[in-house]
Amino acid sequence: MAAGRLSPTRRRTLGRMTEPDSPAPVPDAQLPGGALMRLVRPDDAPALLAAYRRNAAHLAPTEPRRGERFLTLEGQAERIAGQLREWEAGRAVPWVLDGSHVPGAPPVLGTLTFTGIVRGPLLSASVGYWVDGEHTGRGLAGQALAQAVAYARDALGLHRLEAGTLLDNTASQRVLLRAGFTWYGTAPDYLHIAGAWRDHHRYQLILGEVEPRP
């Protein structure tokens, strides 16, 4: 992900790709604070379970309500398997923010995920992320998002990324704006979050003038 930018010609060629026969490689990326941004693995299930349990109160205001199985080892294993199937199909990229080599940090510091990767004339994906409540405000989300933006542009050949936030989630809005995203509207009752339908601000980042597949 830290590779140099592709030439405009190469980006146009990527934009004409159909659904890929195999997923684009996802190299590890060392973030400035010491965390490692990498593709999720099946053996991450215990650490992800611990992370979600540890951050239950932190994430509750910004996430949909989860079933009881979500906070079980089996539930996390099933979720990872589903994410990797989506990655293999070219429809998603699920990263974890690995804190194994950060002094005093837990094994999982958060996640960042591309979902809904669409090619053809749209060439777009949605991005979502969260960071451990004890490690917010340290630039980790912004560092991870910068790596993800470069990957979307240079490896996936996408034209656009989109994201949404609750109206009062100013911290996430700042992360998006610093990464170059722009606000383009507010969607009423956009997602069912914390037990109710919630309005969301919508943001997008145009990655380049990519020519879609004919």
Residue spans for each PLM region:
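Conserved GNAT-fold acetyl-CoA-binding loop/helix
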Residues: 58-81
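Generic, well-ordered alpha-helical segments
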Residues: 40, 51, 68-76, 89
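Acyl-donor (CoA/ACP) binding surface of acyl/acetyltransferases
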Residues: 2-47, 51-61, 96-214
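A short helix-loop-beta-strand connector motif used in the catalytic cores of GNAT acetyltransferases and
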Residues: 67-70, 81-96
